[in-house]
C-alpha cells in the first residue's frame, strides 16, 4: 500500500536545508512537568505528542518488515532523540513565525489534505494508509501545518544566502578530480550549476543553523530526564532511521 508523504522525523529537510540539530541546546530537567518531554520558551512538548510520533516510527519500521530496536539500545535512543529534536524545532518555528509575519491557515491545510485524498483515491483510502503508518488524520493535518510553516520561516531565514563565482571556482579546484569523471560535470562550465546549488545549500544550512541556535538561546529549551538528545546520542547515528517523507 502506498504511503502518504507526511512527516520528517529523522531530520526536517526544507528548501534544500538539513535542519540544525538541537542536541546541544538543552539544559536541566527541573522545570519540565511530569507529562512532558521538553519545554520550549515555557511551552510544554507533551509525552502524548512524543508517543504519537514514536508510534508512527514503530509502524513504519514494522511495515518494512524490520524489527523495531529494543528500548535502551543505541538505535532506539537515536529514534527518541530525533523525535524530540523534531518536536522542539517545530515549536521553535511556531514561536518565531510571527516575527516574520508568516502563518498557515486551516484552509491551506485542508487544501493539502484534499489534494492528498485526490491523489490516493479518496478519504477512506487515505485513512487506511494513515492507520497502516501509525498515524491519524489529526497528525497528518498537524504535520502539514508544521511543514508549511517551517518552509515559510526557512525561506525568510535563508533569503540572503548567496554564492560567488570565486567560491564556485575554489570548489571546482578542490573537487575537479571527482567531478571531471562524470560527463555532466566534466568541465567547470558544465559543473557550474551543480556546484552553485551545492554551495547554496551549504550557505542556507549555515544561516539556518545559526538562526536556530540563536532562537534556542532566546527561548530556552529544557528536557525531561531521559529525553535530552545530547545525552541519548553518544555514538554515531546508525544507518537505519525513519525515512524522511517528502
Task: Kindly give the residue locations of the regions a language model identified.
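N-terminal targeting/tethering segments
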Residues: 29-144
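Acidic/polar surface patches and capping/hinge elements
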Residues: 132-139, 156-188, 203-223
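Alpha-helix boundary/capping detector
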Residues: 110, 114, 123-124, 142, ...
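FKBP-type peptidyl-prolyl cis-trans isomerases
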Residues: 2-10, 21-34, 39-40, 65, ...
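Short, low-structural-confidence N-terminal segments
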Residues: 1-75, 190-246
Amino acid at each position: 500500500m502506498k504511503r502518504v508523504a507526511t512527516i520528517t522525523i529523522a531530520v526536517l529537510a526544507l528548501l534544500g536545508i538539513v535542519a540544525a540539530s538541537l542536541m546541544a541546546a538543552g539544559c536541566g530537567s527541573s522545570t519540565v512537568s511530569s507529562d512532558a518531554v521538553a519545554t520550549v520558551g515555557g511551552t510544554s512538548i507533551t509525552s502524548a505528542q512524543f508517543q504519537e510520533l514514536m508510534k508512527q516510527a514503530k509502524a513504519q519500521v514494522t511495515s518494512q518488515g524490520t524489527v523495531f530496536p529494543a528500548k535502551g539500545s543505541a538505535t532506539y535512543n537515536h529514534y527518541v532523540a530525533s523525535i524530540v529534536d523534531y518536536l522542539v524545532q517545530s515549536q521553535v518555528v511556531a514561536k518565531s513565525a510571527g516575527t516574520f509575519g508568516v502563518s498557515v491557515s486551516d484552509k491551506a491545510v485542508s487544501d493539502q489534505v484534499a489534494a492528498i485524498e485526490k491523489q490516493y483515491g479518496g478519504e477512506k483510502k487515505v485513512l487506511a494508509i494513515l492507520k497502516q503508518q501509525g498515524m491519524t488524520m489529526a497528525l497528518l493535518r498537524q504535520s502539514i501545518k508544521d511543514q508549511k510553516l517551517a518552509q515559510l520561516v526557512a525561506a525568510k531565514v535563508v533569503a540572503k544566502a548567496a554564492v560567488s563565482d570565486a567560491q564556485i571556482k575554489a570548489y571546482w579546484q578542490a573537487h575537479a578530480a571527482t567531478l571531471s569523471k562524470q560527463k555532466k560535470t566534466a568541465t567547470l562550465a558544465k559543473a557550474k550549476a551543480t556546484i552553485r546549488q551545492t554551495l547554496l545549500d551549504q550557505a542556507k544550512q549555515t544561516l539556518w543553523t545559526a538562526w536556530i541556535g540563536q532562537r534556542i538561546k532566546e527561548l530556552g529549551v529544557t528536557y525531561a530526564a531521559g529525553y535530552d538528545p545530547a545525552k541519548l546520542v553518544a555514538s554515531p547515528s546508525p544507518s537505519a532511521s525513519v525515512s524522511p517523507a517528502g
